[in-house]
């Protein structure tokens, strides 16, 4: 290991969707490599200290449900682990312990001490004073853009992990293990930067969305002339054209339900005239179907009483229209269809129809003044 500066920057990257739940891993790069200004003669001791720092990270993953998972390999070991199998989306891509294990094996160092000290390393990480800070920083990263139910599960998992750490015994003190202190401090700072970089574009997107919504609403309310004509009666009836509809451009958050109600009111005021005309057209089309049951029954009663000569006069048609609520055209069509389907004049009536001057049949009183339709004439009459 070469000596260098302690302030080494590290790029940040995430993968996965926070909406999948609190257990979904967070992809991260390697933490800042901890270096020392010690003499080159102590390289082996410094390498062992760095190895312990990475071992703290690996066993911290096993101690809590909030894993710092899916860690990408450092740049120097990328080729060494290229042949490893690809993990699933919710499993670590590379374990720091495995990466460092490969480095140690490649350098001829015995890795047995790292595996035998796993329990003590885990206990040291969970007992470190910065453990709660590390959990909180990780949860804050996962909270960015997450739905409320996921945020609640994250907070619950963080509380459970903190309680598990507290149950293991008293916490340690800073300075007992400088390597662990440096490791925890570096990761906490990294996660805080992650959270800041994630929050910035999310907040900018929310502000942009709210600005566009306000512009759309201002455009819809800035042209009252478009509401004139067919929309004026609706405005007077609803009495909603007040200053309460003005848009506050400084509001950061807008109630979605309030926007829906406002949009519904605007559409009703603007298109109420069209809606009324459409309703009338639908009613007309509905009237073209079957006649109402009560009106049809009245027409059948009249038909049964005048079955011998079912030709109502104009006065009778007007009376039927008034009693049934139908118009005269509907009554005429009903009688025409009824006669075609259910009435055939008798032989005597056929003679009367052909001899319009017959003086003895009282049914012909109105025939000369108002000739009846020819729909009832059968083939025998021709």
UniProtKB/Swiss-Prot annotation:
Nucleus found in the keyword field: yes
Domain named ELK: residues: 262-282
Stated role: Required for shoot apical meristem (SAM) formation during embryogenesis. Negatively regulates ASYMMETRIC LEAVES1 (AS1) and ASYMMETRIC LEAVES2 (AS2 or LBD6). Probably binds to the DNA sequence 5'-TGAC-3'. Binds to RNA.
Keyword Nucleotide-binding in annotation: no
Gene of this entry: STM
Tissue: Expressed in all four types of shoot apical meristems (SAM) i.e. in vegetative, axillary, inflorescence and floral.
Family: Belongs to the TALE/KNOX homeobox family.
GO cellular component, one term: nucleus
Single GO BP term: carpel development
Basic and acidic residues biased stretches: 44-53
SUPFAM superfamilies given in the database record: Homeodomain-like (SSF46689)
Keywords for this protein: Cell junction, Cell membrane, Cytoplasm, Developmental protein, DNA-binding, Endosome, Homeobox, Membrane, Nucleus, RNA-binding
Residues annotated to bind DNA: 283-346
Pfam families: ELK, Homeobox_KN, KNOX1, KNOX2
Region (Disordered): 26-59
Protein name, per record: Homeobox protein SHOOT MERISTEMLESS
PROSITE patterns, alphabetized: ELK, HOMEOBOX_1, HOMEOBOX_2
Chief subcellular location: nucleus
Subcellular location: Nucleus; Cell junction, Plasmodesma; Cytoplasm; Endosome
Subunit structure: Forms homodimers. May form heterodimeric complexes with TALE/BELL proteins BEL1, BLH2, BLH3, BLH8/PNF, BLH9/PNY and ATH1. Interacts with CCT8. Binds to MBP2C; this interaction reduces RNA binding capacity. Interacts with FTIP3 and FTIP4.
GO-annotated molecular function: DNA binding; DNA-binding transcription factor activity; DNA-binding transcription factor activity, RNA polymerase II-specific; protein homodimerization activity; RNA binding
């Amino acid at each position: 290991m070469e000596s260098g500066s302690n302030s080494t920057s590290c790029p940040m990257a995430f993968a996965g969707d926070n909406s999948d739940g609190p257990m979904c891993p967070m992809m991260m790069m390697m933490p800042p490599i901890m270096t020392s200004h010690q003499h080159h003669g102590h390289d082996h001791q410094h390498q062992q200290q760095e190895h312990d720092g990475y071992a703290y990270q690996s066993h911290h993953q096993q101690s809590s449900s909030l894993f710092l998972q899916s860690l990408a390999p450092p740049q120097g070991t990328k080729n060494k682990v290229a042949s490893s199998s690809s993990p699933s989306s919710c499993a670590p891509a590379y374990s720091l312990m495995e990466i460092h294990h490969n480095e140690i094996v490649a350098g001829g160092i015995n890795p047995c001490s790292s595996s035998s000290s796993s329990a003590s390393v885990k206990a040291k990480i969970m007992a470190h004073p910065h453990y709660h800070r590390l959990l909180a920083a990780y949860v804050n990263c996962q909270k960015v853009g997450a739905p409320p139910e996921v945020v609640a599960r994250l907070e619950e998992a963080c509380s459970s992990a903190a309680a598990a750490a507290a149950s293991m015994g008293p916490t340690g003190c800073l300075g007992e293990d400088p390597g662990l202190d440096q490791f925890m401090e570096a990761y906490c700072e990294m996660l805080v930067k992650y959270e800041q970089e994630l929050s910035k574009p999310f907040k900018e997107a929310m502000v942009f969305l709210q600005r566009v919504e306000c512009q759309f609403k201002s455009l819809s309310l800035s042209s009252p002339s478009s509401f004139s004509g067919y929309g004026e009666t609706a405005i007077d009836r609803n009495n909603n054209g007040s200053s309460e509809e003005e848009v506050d451009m400084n509001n950061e958050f807008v109630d979605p339900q309030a926007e829906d109600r406002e949009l519904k009111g605007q559409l009703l005021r603007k298109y109420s005239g069209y809606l009324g005309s459409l309703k009338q057209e639908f009613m007309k089309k509905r009237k073209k179907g079957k006649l109402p049951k009560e009106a049809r029954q009245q027409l059948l009663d009249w038909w049964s009483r005048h079955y011998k000569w079912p030709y109502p006069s104009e006065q009778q048609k007007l009376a039927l229209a008034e009693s049934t609520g139908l118009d005269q055209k509907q009554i005429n069509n009903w009688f025409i269809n009824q006669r075609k389907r259910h009435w055939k004049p008798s032989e005597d009536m056929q003679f009367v129809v052909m001899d319009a001057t017959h003086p003895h049949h009282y049914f012909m009183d109105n025939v000369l003044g108002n000739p009846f339709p020819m729909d009832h004439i059968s083939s025998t009459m021709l």
